[in-house]
């Protein structure tokens, strides 16, 4: 089973991706990790990518796409879940063409829907427990709202990450994601159009639901 997943920062995309990975024993492939793997491993593609990164430039698609494709091809027998790529319409088309050329099927495309303001509030509402950062606490999500200023799981003190409170940085990330002309949503809609032609399946999920309700809906549609 091969899957692409889309969702804005704050939508729970990483959480749902991890649940799907565990359920179907998929390789969970994150675009940033691909760069780190190639650069750290000193591959030819990694060396080329590093030159651009060191100059502060975007790595061109003719380097990025082969990196992604190589990782997908080596993902293992159960398939993969790709997170964080593509990020625009051009990349979506190039990735699709590359998958077709390699005979790799794209079974599902998942989009987690969440209003921009809700996504921003969720990011700014995240709180970290001093005892365990994996303890879920968010002042804007009722199911995991902390008890005052202490962790809802263990009672430890809470803090907020500085970048989670930077509205400007959050806005820039969301500007890219919610752009339906040449941003990440444009990439998602490219696959939505393909699904309308019957060449893949497109799943839309209401990101305002609980983690469990979203998971249950998703797994039913993947079954």
Swiss-Prot record:
It is found in: Cytoplasm. InterPro entries: Adenylat/UMP-CMP_kin, Adenylat_kinase_CS, P-loop_NTPase. GO terms for biological process: AMP salvage. It catalyses: AMP + ATP = 2 ADP. Its EC number is 2.7.4.3. One of its GO terms (cellular component) is cytoplasm. AMP binds at residues 31, 36, 57-59, 84-87, 91, 161, 173. Residues 125-164 are annotated as: LID. One of its GO terms (molecular function) is adenylate kinase activity. Residues 30-59 are annotated as: NMP. Pathway: Purine metabolism; AMP biosynthesis via salvage pathway; AMP from ADP: step 1/1. ATP binds at residues 10-15, 126, 209. It comes from the Bacteria. It is an enzyme of class 2 (transferase). The keyword Transmembrane does not apply. Keywords: ATP-binding, Cytoplasm, Kinase, Nucleotide biosynthesis, Nucleotide-binding, Transferase. The keyword Nucleus does not apply. Belongs to the adenylate kinase family. Monomer. Consists of three domains, a large central CORE domain and two small peripheral domains, NMPbind and LID, which undergo movements during catalysis. The LID domain closes over the site of phosphoryl transfer upon ATP binding. Assembling and dissambling the active center during each catalytic cycle provides an effective means to prevent ATP hydrolysis. PANTHER family: NUCLEOTIDE KINASE (PTHR23359). Catalyzes the reversible transfer of the terminal phosphate group between ATP and AMP. Plays an important role in cellular energy homeostasis and in adenine nucleotide metabolism. This is Adenylate kinase. It comes from Nitratidesulfovibrio vulgaris (strain DSM 19637 / Miyazaki F) (Desulfovibrio vulgaris). The lineage of its organism: Bacteria, Pseudomonadati, Thermodesulfobacteriota, Desulfovibrionia, Desulfovibrionales.
